[in-house]
């Protein structure tokens, strides 16, 4: 047998219906702009302003002073 006759493969032209280069899908869980049928509607998120908290600021300064003294 002739080995060169056995070692070949065929190449087919891509279909003409493709609209452009293939791009991979986004990772699982990555939000997309398109809504999929069966997805639950997104709930509205309400945020509340907590205002200025002087105790938190004082605690942060105290923590920095303690860490500075320890190291």
UniProtKB/Swiss-Prot annotation:
Organism: Arabidopsis thaliana (Mouse-ear cress)
Highest taxon, organism lineage: Eukaryota
GO cellular component, one term: cytosol
UniProt function note: Involved in resistance to abiotic stress.
Membrane-spanning ranges: 48-64
UniProt family annotation: Belongs to the CYSTM1 family.
Reported induction: Induced by heat in shoots, but suppressed in roots. Repressed in roots in response to cold, drought and salt.
Residue ranges the record marks as coiled coil: none
Membrane topology: Single-pass membrane protein
Localization of this protein: Membrane; Nucleus
Protein name: Protein CYSTEINE-RICH TRANSMEMBRANE MODULE 8
Region annotation Disordered: where it falls in the sequence: 1-35
Tissues where this protein is expressed: Mostly expressed in stems, siliques, roots and flowers and, to a lower extent, in leaves.
Compositional bias per record (Polar residues), positions renumbered to this chain: 1-22
Assigned keywords, A-Z: Membrane, Nucleus, Transmembrane, Transmembrane helix
Keyword Membrane in annotation: yes
Keyword Transmembrane: yes
